[in-house]
């Protein structure tokens, strides 16, 4: 790590400790040239797979897009924001766990439906109706029947 004071390349770590929930490391460093001390924070960079859309276009994973879609389905439903965030984190973990560099958007949609089914059945039906392009009332009825099984 370069010294922020003199830009020297040689620095040493004096102290390291975990911060908060252990997802971050705080390091106290000292420059070996100018002897100034400074603090750095390290966080693991978790790379998400790229999303392959149905038209084969590839784009980076967009957590905000995932959140917006789930919140739209959950609109005016009694689900806490903590539960929504936990579901989003679970989906992100599932995506990373695939070990793939690219993942079809259809698979992400299936992960979202799994989580919505656990959170709120009405939100699940709302999302499924758009995601699976329900044509008529019969499609809704079939999906509701699956939920009741």
Curated annotation (Swiss-Prot):
Residues 49-139 form the ATP-cone domain. The keyword Lyase does not apply. Its cofactor is Zn(2+). One of its GO terms (molecular function) is zinc ion binding. A zinc finger (unnamed) spans 3-34. One of its GO terms (biological process) is negative regulation of DNA-templated transcription. Pfam families: ATP-cone, Zn_ribbon_NrdR. Negatively regulates transcription of bacterial ribonucleotide reductase nrd genes and operons by binding to NrdR-boxes. This is Transcriptional repressor NrdR. It comes from Proteus mirabilis (strain HI4320).
């Amino acid at each position: 790590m370069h010294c922020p004071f003199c830009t020297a390349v040689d620095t040493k770590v004096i102290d390291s400790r975990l911060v908060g929930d252990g997802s971050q490391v705080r390091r106290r460093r000292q420059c070996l040239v100018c002897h100034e001390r400074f603090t750095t924070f390290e966080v693991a960079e978790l790379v998400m797979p790229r999303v392959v859309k149905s038209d084969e276009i590839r784009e980076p994973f967009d957590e905000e897009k995932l959140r917006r879609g789930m919140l739209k389905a959950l609109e005016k439903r009694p689900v806490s924001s903590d539960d929504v965030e936990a579901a989003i984190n679970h989906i992100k973990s599932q995506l990373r766990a695939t070990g793939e560099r690219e993942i079809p958007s259809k698979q992400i949609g299936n992960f979202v439906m799994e989580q919505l089914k656990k959170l709120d059945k009405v939100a699940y039906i709302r999302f499924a109706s758009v995601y699976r392009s329900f044509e008529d009332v019969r499609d809704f009825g079939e999906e509701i029947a699956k939920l009741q099984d």
